Amino acid sequence: MAKQILFDRDAREKLKKGVDALADAVKVTLGPKGRNVILDKKFGSPAITKDGVSVAKDIELKDAIENMGAQLVKEVASKTADQAGDGTTTATVLTQAIFNAGLKNVAAGANPMDLKRGIDKAVSAIIADLKVQSKKISNSNEIAQVATISANNDHEIGKMIAHAMDKVGKDGVITVEEAKGTETEVKTVEGMQFDRGYLSPYFVTNTDKMEVELDRPYILIYDKKVSSMKELLPILEQVVQSGRPLLIIAEDVDGEALATLVVNKIRGALKIAAVKAPGFGDRRKAMLEDIAILTGGTVISEESGYKLENATLEYLGTAEKINIDKDNTTVVNGSGLKDNIVARVNQIKSQMENTTSDYDREKLQERLAKLSGGVAIMYIGAATEVEMKEKKDRVDDALHATRAAVEEGIVPGGGVALIRAGAALDNVAFHNEDEKTGIQIIRTAIESPLRAIVYNAGLEGSVIVQKVKEGTGDYGYNAREDRYEAMIAAGIIDPTKVTRLALENAASVASLLLTTECVVADEPEEKSAMPPMGGGGMGGMM
């Protein structure tokens, strides 16, 4: 395949077109007056979303080099979403602002590497200032405010997330599911989550979410590795006859055993999934015992005199539902006896009192939360499927933002925190004029989120940015109410982690784009013309 190779300004200008195409599509969603984007789907009805990363993921450009620029900005949005769960649109807007300002300076003769050093120094200074501005979340009301902002100013969702966190604690497990009707509600169920995902993606039952969902499954808990199908076959046959799904939790499942399970799952002969046991060493044994007590099963362990080939259905635990993604397994409503669970909880509490190690105490606390905390399920109701998907996206965003806020605290929202942090750039040392220019690029770029919020509200950005810069503390512009006020008192707050990661990831990719001197991509294939059709009729006929 022939390649096209572009250098210097030509390469960067092409990349810029891709960056602008994606960023312009994403930034229409920013702020309280941001608009929706409709995404065409190959199958089913179009999706309507105000979630920046959903828009970014859907964009592919025809030109290969422009598409490279778009894909790199998509990486910023995806990474920010993965790490913080929100802030994807802010990250995209910042990337575009840093890259475009940098591009003008490179075209004017600035050294890209010195610009990058200046940008990196400035970003470090801004992040240090954000940490100083940050304020710990202290009550349920502030949790509701963070969730409300992330859910596009939906107060109902904000209150529900705060309510769910009250029920299961800040470290508890909250899952989002579709409701049968139009009502949205929160329910708490006894449940447990551990940090092990499925052993093979072929076990996935819900391909949209890439999750395994098992209803009323049997749960086989084994403390050794399963490699041979021979030892697993007797219990598998019993499960197949019962017609129920099976989850295998073992030290590992590999080789012939894993291959056979995958083949049976693909053929539809058996609804099955396998995950590795959580923890290591003695903690693994203790956690397997916790799972067994929660689900009413028995840990099949040769130390206790049990062999896998002799196992029957009586040894298996059961639960109402199990959800497994690539990282976590959640067991909902295990069938274990209440008395046994209470006894186990009390045993862990006494171990916590007797231990002298902070590490052990922390791990025991984790086990205690898993056994007694439960899982909160948010059932999202909507009138149509399209509305349901859009609402679920917003709830997911809000949940992630709230967790981020609990983790690292909050800063004033509406783009104010970044503008206030700009003062820290006055003290950043630089070695040459190009580094100074890099610092100046960040000074200008940190205004871009507020400019985009104001633009989406139908107003002129420069005037409002200047007025906000003249203020102090959390004084900013409330685009929803069209007035200037104290952001935190008005409930306009952002998680510190979201703002920090948006800037870090944006600066990282924008700097790489600026220091690009050459781009190599496939030449577009020319479609060959259709061959001429043969003449109709038969030769030689009179």
UniProtKB/Swiss-Prot annotation:
InterPro entries: Chaperonin_Cpn60_CS, Cpn60/GroEL, Cpn60/GroEL/TCP-1, GroEL-like_apical_dom_sf, GROEL-like_equatorial_sf, TCP-1-like_intermed_sf. It catalyses: ATP + H2O + a folded polypeptide = ADP + phosphate + an unfolded polypeptide. Its EC number is 5.6.1.7. ATP binds at residues 29-32, 50, 86-90, 414, 494. CDD domains: GroEL. Belongs to the chaperonin (HSP60) family. This is Chaperonin GroEL. The lineage of its organism: Bacteria, Pseudomonadati, Bacteroidota, Cytophagia, Cytophagales.
